[in-house]
Amino acid sequence: MQLVVARIGRAHGIKGEVTVEVRTDEPELRLGPGAVLATDPASTGPLTIESGRVHSGRLLLRFAGVHDRTGAEALRNTLLIADVDPDERPEDEDEYYDHQLIDLDVVTEDGTEVGRITEISHLPTQDLFVVERPDGSEVYVPFVSEIVTGIDLDAQRAVIDPPPGLIDDRAEIASARDAGAEDAGDEA
C-alpha cells in the first residue's frame, strides 16, 4: 500500500534543497537519507533522499540527482509516497492513515446520515474531512476531537457532533456582542 508522507514546497538556496510539508508522524522513519519514494506525479520520481535537516522549524531535503535551484523548483508541489505494509497502524490509537478514513460513512451522534468521506484535506492548522452528501454536494468537517467524536474502522463509520451551521443552515450567533450588533442594525 502507498502512503503520502510529504509534499515538496519551495526550493531553498542554490544547492538543490527543498522545503517539505510533512504528512507523517514518523518523518525520521519515512524521510531519512537513503529512503526511495514514489511521487505524484509519477513522472518526477522515484526520488532518493540524499540528506535532510531542519532549518527554522522546517524540514529541508536534498534528493539524489538534484543539485541546483532549478532542479529543486521543478519538484515543487510533488507528493512523496512511501510503500507501507497495509496492516500497519499508527502508534497512537487516535491516529489514522488517510486510506483508513476514505470511504467511511459519516453520521451524527443521533445516527443521521451525513455522507461519505471522499478526501482528507491537509491544511496548516488542521485536517478536514471532505464529505460527499447523498445529494452530491460536499461539506467540510474539521478533523478535531470536539467535532469528530468517534471513528469505528470495523463499522466503517465516523461519528460527528457538528456545531449548528456546519452541515446545515442553522448557524447560531457566536456571541452576545454579535447579537447586539445585529439588533442595533435592525433599528437603523
UniProtKB/Swiss-Prot annotation:
Residues annotated as domain PRC barrel: 93-166
Cellular localization per UniProt: Cytoplasm
Keywords: Chaperone, Cytoplasm, Ribosome biogenesis, rRNA processing
Origin: domain of life: Bacteria
Gene Ontology CC entries for this record: cytoplasm; ribosome
Coiled-coil stretches: none
Cited Gene3D superfamilies: PRC-barrel domain (2.30.30.240), RimM (2.40.30.60)
Any one GO molecular function term: ribosome binding
UniProt GO BP: ribosomal small subunit biogenesis; rRNA processing
SUPFAM superfamilies per UniProt: PRC-barrel domain, Translation proteins
Primary residence: cytoplasm
Entry text on domains: The PRC barrel domain binds ribosomal protein uS19.
Purpose of the protein: An accessory protein needed during the final step in the assembly of 30S ribosomal subunit, possibly for assembly of the head region. Essential for efficient processing of 16S rRNA. May be needed both before and after RbfA during the maturation of 16S rRNA. It has affinity for free ribosomal 30S subunits but not for 70S ribosomes.
Family: Belongs to the RimM family.
Subunit structure: Binds ribosomal protein uS19.
Name listed for the protein in its UniProt record: Ribosome maturation factor RimM
UniProt organism field: Streptomyces lividans
